């Protein structure tokens, strides 16, 4: 059998093995060394193949697909710096838990460290960031197909969250003979080919037990913090906290409906602090909290008990509280820890949150990014989803908006980078094929500009709002030196996105008032399946200044009057 044909068989077994663990979407970049993997993916009828010319965007596309499906997604790239371009998406997957399998083609060992073209040291390139790593040998019939299948099965069984990096060296020739489908090497797997089960199956039965003190603790004064959790979990946590009578501090990604909106504006108020300091237990669901004041309160609170519930292992508590971490999903934990009917104990918080929300409405009565953040719920598509960018816009939405309970909200808030946001939102849209609203800043859009190509292929109305405040205006909120702030931090660019939209064949609109924005977005949801890029050219500092102003006003306000 020729080398090219056996390379194809080896790759065929790899891809088929991964489908037994739920793999359906695979993202492929162009490259020669990855030919065996690419052709194996193309030939596997179980797989939906996505392509992109930029490996950094491709990795984030896979991340978005994994976020929305909650299933493993694979990436195929060629050798060399193509592999390094996957680093940001791999890091994000490790922090937010999406299972992404990075299949990186490589030169064989004899071509490493000898000056061969496009050959770099790929083994261990991602250091400690993957949850699992496999460095496969060069394909050879001396290694049984059973070893290859069981090795991959074992890695997938261990991949509870995060990334799996599989480095796959292939020797030339890479092209030539068609694959031989029935050989002694593949026949060793027998009836596995006709099944849909893994070769090596592992059954995990995590025991979820009720905490021995729960009957006593649920009668105490508690506070619930909700970070990044799923839409279903957000609904369940909100109902659970309400039944207990415990105040719920919900992050923008909590999908709880934020029953106490604008918390990041009022958490520093002395009356609020005095009331919340009575909490005897604080229970945090999920992580990646956005608001600065919420993070400060979380770090400074000192209840008798502090519990964190998240399926991702690790502390997930930057406040380093003494307490307990439950590494399981919030839904599993809630089942084992039912609520009882208690009267609310922090009675003033509902009044404070309502007054603050009304004040935000009054202050943001002119067109700008603060108003858009506050009124964002009016722009959401029915039965759709929201993808939120990073930097300033997510903080404004977290502080000013109240999003519907259970409405799907996704973002890259693990490492919170501005790279790969357009490509991640494209993956989210492709996975669900639902109407999708993406909102992000101008620098984020410039950083990932070529990923607008991924928004050409859509399955439902797709709106991308770019809030253009001419640079990184989040830095105007920080005590950066005035003399250097503009040049070295904000970096104004004086660009707009009209020609970028035209380059990628996307519709473009630049409304200059709220009514025009609302009318445009509403028409998009009622129209055909296409992408509309909406650019909001806003005052450079209005959003940051409004946030700072409101924090100061609400912190100093006497809500007892």
UniProtKB/Swiss-Prot annotation:
It catalyses: isochorismate + 2-oxoglutarate + H(+) = 5-enolpyruvoyl-6-hydroxy-2-succinyl-cyclohex-3-ene-1-carboxylate + CO2. GO terms for biological process: menaquinone biosynthetic process. Belongs to the TPP enzyme family. MenD subfamily. Its cofactor is Mg(2+); Mn(2+); thiamine diphosphate. This is 2-succinyl-5-enolpyruvyl-6-hydroxy-3-cyclohexene-1-carboxylate synthase. Transmembrane segments: none annotated. Homodimer. It is an enzyme of class 2 (transferase). Keywords: Magnesium, Manganese, Menaquinone biosynthesis, Metal-binding, Thiamine pyrophosphate, Transferase. Its EC number is 2.2.1.9. It comes from Proteus mirabilis (strain HI4320). Pfam families: TPP_enzyme_M_2, TPP_enzyme_N. One of its GO terms (molecular function) is thiamine pyrophosphate binding.
């Amino acid at each position: 059998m020729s080398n090219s044909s056996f390379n194809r068989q080896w790759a065929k077994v790899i891809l088929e093995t991964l489908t037994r663990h739920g793999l359906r979407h695979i993202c492929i970049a162009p490259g020669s060394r990855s030919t065996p993997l690419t052709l194996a993916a193309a030939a596997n009828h179980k797989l939906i193949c996505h392509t992109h010319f930029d490996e950094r965007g491709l990795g984030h596309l896979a991340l978005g697909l994994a976020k929305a499906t909650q299933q493993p997604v694979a990436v195929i790239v060629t050798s060399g710096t193509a592999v390094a371009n996957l680093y940001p998406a791999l890091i994000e997957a490790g922090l937010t838990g999406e299972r992404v399998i990075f299949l990186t083609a490589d030169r064989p060992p004899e071509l490493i460290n000898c000056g061969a073209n496009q050959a770099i040291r790929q083994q261990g390139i991602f250091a400690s960031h993957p949850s699992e790593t496999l460095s496969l040998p060069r394909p050879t019939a001396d290694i049984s197909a059973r070893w290859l299948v069981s090795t991959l099965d074992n890695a997938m069984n261990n991949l509870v969250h995060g990334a799996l990096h599989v480095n796959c060296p292939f020797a030339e020739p890479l092209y030539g003979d068609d694959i031989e489908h029935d050989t002694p090497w593949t026949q060793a797997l027998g009836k596995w080919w006709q099944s849909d089960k893994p070769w090596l199956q592992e059954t995990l039965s995590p025991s979820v037990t009720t905490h021995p003190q729960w009957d006593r603790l649920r009668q105490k004064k508690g506070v619930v913090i909700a970070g990044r959790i799923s839409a279903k979990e957000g609904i369940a946590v909100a109902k659970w906290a309400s039944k207990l009578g415990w105040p719920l501090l919900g992050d923008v990604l909590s999908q709880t409906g934020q029953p106490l909106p604008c918390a990041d504006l009022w958490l520093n108020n002395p009356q609020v602090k005095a009331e919340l300091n009575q909490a005897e237990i604080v229970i945090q669901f999920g992580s990646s909290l956005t608001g600065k004041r919420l993070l400060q309160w979380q770090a400074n609170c000192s209840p008798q008990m502090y519990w964190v519930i998240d399926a991702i292992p690790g502390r997930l508590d930057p406040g380093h509280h003494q307490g307990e971490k439950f590494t399981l999903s919030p839904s599993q934990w809630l089942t084992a820890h039912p609520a009882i009917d208690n009267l609310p104990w922090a009675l003033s918080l509902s009044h404070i949150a309502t007054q603050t929300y009304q004040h935000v409405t009054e202050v943001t009565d002119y067109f700008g990014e603060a108003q858009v953040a506050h009124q964002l719920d009016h722009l959401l598509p029915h039965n759709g989803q929201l993808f939120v960018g990073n930097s300033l816009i997510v903080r404004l939405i977290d502080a000013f908006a109240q999003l519907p309970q259970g409405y799907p909200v996704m973002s890259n808030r693990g490492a919170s980078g501005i790279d790969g946001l357009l490509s991640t939102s494209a993956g989210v849209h492709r996975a669900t094929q639902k109407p999708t609203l993406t909102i992000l800043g101008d620098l984020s859009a410039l950083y990932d500009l070529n990923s607008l190509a991924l928004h050409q292929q859509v399955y439902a109305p797709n709106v991308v709002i770019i809030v253009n405040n001419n640079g990184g205006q989040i830095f105007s909120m920080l005590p950066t030196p005035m003399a250097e702030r503009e040049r070295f931090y904000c970096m104004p660019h004086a660009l707009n996105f009209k020609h970028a939209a035209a380059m990628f064949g996307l519709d473009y609109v630049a409304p200059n008032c709220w009514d025009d924005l609302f009318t445009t977005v509403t028409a998009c949801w009622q129209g055909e399946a296409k992408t509309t890029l909406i650019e909001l050219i806003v005052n450079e500092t209005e959003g940051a200044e409004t946030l700072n102003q409101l924090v100061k006003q609400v912190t100093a306000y006497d809500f007892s009057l």
